[in-house]
């Protein structure tokens, strides 16, 4: 079997950033998949499931209620390796196009202090696995270390 595209990225060189992972044609439409890499693969600890689960709930809620992106949001969810998230948007985008949206979204997560949306037994299959404090911290870290001063080296996969 051939490697899938995401396994051909050099994860030794990969740093936290906002990357286009792939673009898929569905009929006449394009769906862009973004790699929102929050930690350095194989260099630092991965995120725990509780904070990732909290970020997933907050980000999905934010995106699906966003005035410009609600109807374009296909999916937001965690990477199996726990170093980041995937965001799928309807449309043909480049990484730099969504940096303002990512800043807005991660500021929302950083500043969120209320009850996590969907964090109940009725709404979620694993509602007890949440950690809002760590989600706030990781969002702040991603903003401060990556998003607020992002450049081309964090927008295009390394060669």
Which residues fall in each region the model found?
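Conserved alpha/beta core surface patches that mediate binding of polyanionic ligands
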Residues: 13-18, 61-70
